[in-house]
Amino acid sequence: MSDEVVLLDTWASMYGMRARIALAEKGVRYEYKEENLMNRSPLLLQMNPIHKKIPVLIHNGKPICESAIIVQYIDEVWNDKSPLMPSDPYKRSQARFWVDYIDKKIYDTWKKMWLSKGEEHEEGKKELISIFKQLEETLTDKPFYGDDTFGFVDLCLITFSSWFYTYETYGNFKMEEECPKLMAWVKRCMERETVSNTLPDAKKVYGLIVELQKTLESK
């Protein structure tokens, strides 16, 4: 019996993009279901009753939640090609550390910058840039975070690049000027079809955020 794979997601989610890239890397066929986060589907609430968030991967009727966990699950289940996690236990631990850092830092700091003004906005902007500078420093002179190969950290970070234009526009800074090595890494990642075919247009993401802000301000 063939695997039944369903992904509950929304197009602009950098977390959902992770699952899509991982599935593409493994060549897994799946059904994509776009969720409206203002009106969550009964299936999403059933499959992720704790957090009620996307993405959710449903594999043969069983839900897997949280994007970093989903990517690791995909790597373990479809392990016959394109390994994403390092084989060395120490390198695996380091990869998990940096993905945890990414997940605890970037989105919350961006939100702080986005939803504030004046001094707090500037503080959020400086903090966001410092996070990317730290990630750039961690990359060192390697082509990828997985050394010579595209791996777990690369996959989990590259999805944020589709939001860089939004960060830059709201923060009035340029990633190319602040983090040139990181942007060179983005270009390398975008050479992979699994990445370039998954990431949405950056200006489309920005348009969504502008509309979302208008909605929030009207309430």
UniProtKB/Swiss-Prot annotation:
It holds the Pfam family GST_C. Glutathione binds at S13, I54, E66, S67. One of its GO terms (molecular function) is glutathione transferase activity. PROSITE patterns: GST_CTER, GST_NTER. GO terms for biological process: glutathione metabolic process. Its EC number is 2.5.1.18. Homodimer. degradation; (R)-lactate from methylglyoxal: step 1/2. Residues 88-216 form the GST C-terminal domain. CDD domains: GST_C_Tau, GST_N_Tau. This is Glutathione S-transferase 3. Gene3D superfamilies: 1.20.1050.10, Glutaredoxin. It catalyses: RX + glutathione = an S-substituted glutathione + a halide anion + H(+). Keywords: Transferase. Residues 3-82 form the GST N-terminal domain. GO terms for cellular component: cytoplasm. InterPro entries: Glutathione-S-Trfase_C-like (IPR010987), Glutathione-S-Trfase_C_sf (IPR036282), Glutathione_S-Trfase (IPR040079), Glutathione_S-Trfase_N (IPR004045), GST_C (IPR004046), GST_C_Tau (IPR045074), Omega/Tau-like (IPR045073), Thioredoxin-like_sf (IPR036249). Conjugation of reduced glutathione to a wide number of exogenous and endogenous hydrophobic electrophiles. Involved in the detoxification of certain herbicides. It comes from Glycine max. The keyword Endoplasmic reticulum does not apply. Belongs to the GST superfamily. HSP26 family.
